[in-house]
């Protein structure tokens, strides 16, 4: 009972349960990662027992934790999942794979640095602080390998089958590698007894510093001459409206200042990453139909989307006054 009511276990279950309504991919990722952490903790808790009994206790309690956390996480997510319809169809074997040189261009440095860290831990013996680093490394390596083996089938199946799986998993891998490197490079550099390992660490660190220069290129590519005050853009995402759509900018300010509640804003529907749906985006008010592809991705079915898109278009283009009034009554 004490193992199930541990505050850390309860908080962990609730927090990963939140991933159901923020990003379900992260629920799977951190459920597995957290499970590995729980197994390690249980190994430490029962390390004084004899080996056969220690293994049984560790795996038994870990399995109990796994079931309990999964149950609590799903209970925490019930207010969302009871009304949610997933767009995922199934998991399939990957038919396309990354080209080796492209794969290693992106992941070679963090993978080599991680393996070097594992080597150090194995040869010198693991310190208590190494456990989290090892957990991050194993998880990150697994996340960059999985999309080369399987992927989740969704609306991108025909043209970009692995794109969503690759993005969701490797994004988390990138984050884990970044956290790991902050610890691993210092851990490796402080090792004084192994000259070869220190040389390899220096090479990895030099490559890492070289990669940091990309930041300068990226900033200039996105924002131009940042040192020129005349080209300052700032962090205000609505600023472009003042020059591109000044009338809309004024309307958005008025809505933000005067409208209360959640009335529906009717806007023409368009593609993702465009100027469509700008009023609902900048005010937070609901609209009849958001960016088409995003709405499709969240639902996996275009039937209702096409119907709504046609109705919105009819409201703006129809010459039949009665039809427009009827559609407005339904939509807004």
Q: Where do the model's predicted regions map?
A:
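Membrane-helix boundary/interfacial segments in multi-pass membrane proteins
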Residues: 83-105, 146-176, 229-231
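Alpha-helical transmembrane segments at the extracellular/periplasmic loop-to-helix junctions
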Residues: 1, 70-74, 78, 94-124, ...
């Amino acid at each position: 009972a004490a193992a199930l009511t541990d505050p850390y276990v309860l908080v962990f279950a609730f927090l990963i349960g939140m991933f159901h309504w923020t990003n379900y991919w992260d629920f799977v990722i951190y459920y597995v990662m957290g499970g590995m952490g729980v197994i390690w903790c249980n190994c430490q808790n029962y390390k004084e027992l004899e080996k056969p009994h220690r293994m049984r206790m560790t795996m038994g309690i870990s399995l109990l934790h796994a079931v309990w956390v999964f149950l609590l996480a799903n209970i925490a997510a019930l207010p969302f999942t009871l009304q949610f319809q997933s767009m995922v169809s199934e998991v399939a074997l990957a038919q396309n794979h990354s080209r080796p040189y492209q794969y290693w261009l992106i992941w070679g440095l963090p993978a080599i640095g991680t393996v070097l860290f594992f080597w150090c831990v194995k040869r010198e013996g693991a310190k208590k602080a190494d456990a989290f680093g090892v957990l991050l490394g194993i998880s990150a390596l697994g996340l960059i390998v999985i999309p080369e083996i399987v992927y989740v089938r969704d609306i991108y199946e025909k043209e970009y089958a692995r794109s969503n799986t690759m993005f969701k998993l490797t994004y988390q891998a990138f984050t884990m590698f970044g956290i790991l490197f902050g610890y691993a490079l210092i851990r490796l550099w402080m090792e004084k007894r192994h000259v070869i390992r220190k040389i390899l660490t220096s090479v990895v660190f030099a490559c890492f510093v070289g990669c940091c220069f990309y930041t300068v290129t990226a900033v200039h590519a996105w924002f131009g001459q940042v040192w020129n005050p005349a080209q300052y853009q700032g962090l205000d995402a609505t600023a472009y409206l003042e020059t591109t759509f000044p009338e809309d900018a004024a309307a958005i300010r008025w809505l933000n200042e005067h409208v209360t509640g959640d009335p529906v804003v009717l806007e023409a529907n368009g593609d993702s990453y465009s100027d469509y749906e700008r009023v609902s985006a900048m005010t937070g008010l609901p609209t009849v139909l958001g960016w088409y592809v995003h709405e499709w991705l969240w639902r996996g079915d275009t039937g209702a989307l096409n119907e709504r898109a046609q109705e919105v278009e009819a409201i703006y283009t129809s010459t039949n006054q009665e039809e427009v009034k009827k559609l407005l009554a339904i939509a807004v």
